[in-house]
């Protein structure tokens, strides 16, 4: 059993790397008296690339500010080699902004040197894969982009510029190189995606054991791109992250885990642990906070605040706020223009509302604070049970699992293990009862959904099976149980039963992850 911060241990870093990645207006003002570079930067972050190019054509080509603007535009259009070449000039490349752009340009060039590109010209989507084994994700990624763009247009008034660019990378080093997010920060907070430079860079689900909710993560990051376009990259971090967390689930039907645990309960626990921060003191990125616990609490704070703002304001308040940020001197000015109150005034109202929420228990399995009692012993017993399963001793494995306290079954990885053991002892009914109510799980978990789907199909409940396998694929698309809908030791089902999932099954088989206890 692995103690996992299921809700926010995998942090989606964002375009809100504001302090280190935004264009420097001070430099532009010094050697760009006509403002061509500044206007081009605004057009670039708004993804109006043709207009940005036209603006730069009017400018002095030797101006450092203009060269920086051209390098930025090239990076947004994925011409990483051109970015690096433009910044080879010493007086440009040695500026702070120039060094950052040059580093990202070189990193991007290395990562994308041998990538495979899938283009959907009809829908305006370009997906670049560092590893060809991830290409079978394309149908799921395209479907997510289309639905997320529609929901973001509905909620935020976004007019999407095409194409929407996505790069899928194989590891955190590549994620860091492509985006400028420090590798150490990505490791500390468990970052799996970054929206910056006009694209979403997404870590392959293959990089994480049993994947992660990559479809919601993609919707989250697309929200950051939408906010950057609408505000010309002038949105504060609390707005970026709060709106992205709100929107990451609005592209699909509501799910069982969308409000579990409630963000208010996480904030309350964070306050007890002194992990909370003022909304305007979050730093340049949540992905750069000192720990995953701190990131969890920060995400909960901004999510709760934006939820309160949206629910107590007119329906068009968020779209109007994004537009107001384009020209307002500060975020406070924009907020006051739209709502009549500043952030500090809203903060007082939000915290007063927060205090009215009844105290909710937060499962110790969630990950904030002290480790639950008995965790070490439970981990050892679960590992022993896995090894016994791998050698065909299911009854003995069940004996070990029965010694683990029942409250530990909130951990879905342990619940999955017990369900697999029950399957192996011909106790399908007990396994069904164990997985029947996902509300008993701490968080959504692909393998649990896969077993649930398999059991539902065996008893003839096809609708429940389809829902369960859909959830399994959304989290663990390269797991054999999710993609092939069978045990790893079983032959593949008929391909027509898998439908569009057949290529994922083939990829999962080629990956050949060992089954329980066979590592």
PLM region descriptions:
Residues 9-19:
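Bacterial N-terminal signal peptides
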Residues 1-4:
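N-terminal secretory signal peptides that target proteins for export/translocation
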Residues 76-126:
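Long amphipathic alpha-helical scaffold segments
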Residues 35, 39, 51, 82-85, ...:
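Extracytoplasmic/secreted proteins, especially bacterial periplasmic and envelope-associated proteins
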Residues 45, 57, 61, 75-78, ...:
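Sec-exported extracytoplasmic/periplasmic mature domains
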Residues 17-31:
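Bacterial Sec-dependent signal peptides at the C-terminal "C-region" and cleavage site
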Residues 114-237, 247-254, 267-276, 280, ...:
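Juxtacatalytic substrate-recognition/specificity segment
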């Amino acid at each position: 059993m692995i103690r996992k911060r299921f809700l926010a241990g995998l942090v989606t870093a964002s375009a809100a790397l504001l302090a280190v990645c935004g264009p420097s207006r001070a430099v532009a003002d010094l050697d760009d008296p006509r403002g061509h570079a500044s206007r081009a930067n605004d057009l670039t972050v708004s993804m109006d690339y043709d207009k940005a190019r036209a603006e730069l054509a009017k400018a002095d080509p030797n101006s450092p500010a203009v060269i920086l603007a051209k390098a930025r535009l090239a990076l947004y259009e994925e011409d990483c080699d051109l970015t690096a070449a433009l910044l080879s000039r010493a007086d440009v490349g040695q500026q702070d902004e120039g060094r950052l752009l040059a580093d990202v340009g070189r990193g991007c060039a290395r990562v994308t040197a041998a990538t495979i590109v899938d283009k959907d010209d009809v829908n305006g989507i370009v997906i670049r894969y560092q590893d060809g084994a991830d290409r079978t994700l394309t149908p799921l990624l395209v479907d997510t982009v289309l639905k997320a763009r529609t929901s973001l247009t509905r909620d935020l008034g976004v007019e999407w510029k095409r194409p929407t660019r996505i790069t899928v990378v194989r590891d955190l080093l590549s994620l860091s190189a492509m985006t400028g997010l420090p590798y150490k920060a990505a490791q500390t907070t468990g970052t799996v995606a970054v929206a910056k430079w006009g694209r979403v860079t997404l870590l392959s689900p293959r990089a994480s054991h049993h994947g992660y909710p990559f479809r919601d993560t993609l919707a989250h990051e697309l929200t950051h791109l939408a906010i950057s376009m609408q505000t010309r990259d002038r949105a504060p971090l609390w707005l970026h992250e709060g709106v992205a967390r709100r929107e990451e689930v609005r592209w699909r039907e509501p799910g069982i885990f969308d409000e579990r645990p409630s963000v208010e309960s996480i904030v309350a626990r964070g306050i007890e642990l002194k992990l909370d921060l003022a909304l305007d003191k979050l730093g340049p990125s949540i992905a750069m906070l000192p720990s995953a616990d701190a990131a969890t609490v920060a995400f909960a704070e901004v999510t709760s605040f934006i939820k309160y703002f949206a629910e107590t304001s007119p329906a068009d308040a968020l779209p109007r706020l994004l537009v107001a940020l384009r020209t307002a001197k500060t975020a406070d000015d924009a907020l006051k223009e739209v709502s009549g109150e500043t952030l500090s005034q809203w903060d007082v109202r939000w915290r007063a509302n927060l205090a009215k929420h009844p105290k909710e228990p937060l499962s110790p399995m969630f990950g904030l604070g002290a480790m639950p009692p008995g965790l070490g012993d439970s981990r050892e017993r679960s590992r022993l049970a896995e090894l016994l399963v791998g050698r065909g001793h299911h009854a003995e494995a069940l004996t070990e699992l029965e010694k683990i306290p029942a409250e530990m079954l909130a951990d879905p990885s342990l619940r999955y293990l017990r369900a697999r053991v029950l399957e192996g002892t011909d106790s399908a009914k007990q396994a069904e009862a164990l997985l029947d109510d996902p509300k008993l799980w701490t968080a959504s978990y692909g393998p649990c959904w896969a077993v649930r789907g398999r059991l539902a199909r065996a008893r003839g409940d096809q609708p429940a099976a389809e829902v369960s396998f859909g959830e399994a694929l959304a989290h663990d698309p390269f797991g054999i149980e999710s993609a092939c809908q069978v045990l790893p030791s079983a032959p593949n089902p008929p391909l027509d039963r898998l439908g569009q999932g057949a290529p994922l099954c083939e990829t999962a088989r080629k990956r050949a992850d060992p089954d329980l206890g066979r590592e």
